[in-house]
């Protein structure tokens, strides 16, 4: 797995994050949106992270959707398989 993808997985494992929060991680400033999207899709496809919808009641209002956009309503969580991968590769003890 790419080093950037592993770092994204480690960050999501530490704290569940939205796409915007992942995008604003300090070590991803030089990575394109395509690279971040590819890493997240790879993690989802390999079942290392899951998406969960949050703030479902807030998202029903039109002004909330206009202000925050689509990506705010989902958070990424590390799965058990993802945490096991991190342990095997030395990110967790």
Predicted regions and their residues:
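Short acidic, hydrophobic short linear motifs in intrinsically disordered regions
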Residues: 17-27
């Amino acid at each position: 797995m790419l080093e950037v993808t592993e770092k994204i997985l480690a960050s999501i494992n530490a704290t569940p994050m939205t796409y915007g929060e992942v995008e604003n991680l300090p070590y991803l400033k030089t990575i394109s949106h395509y690279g971040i999207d590819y890493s997240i899709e790879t993690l989802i496809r390999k079942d290392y992270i899951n998406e969960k919808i949050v703030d479902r009641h807030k998202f029903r209002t039109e002004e909330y959707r206009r202000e925050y956009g689509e990506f705010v309503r989902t958070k990424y969580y590390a799965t058990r398989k993802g945490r096991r991968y991190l342990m095997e590769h030395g990110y967790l003890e």
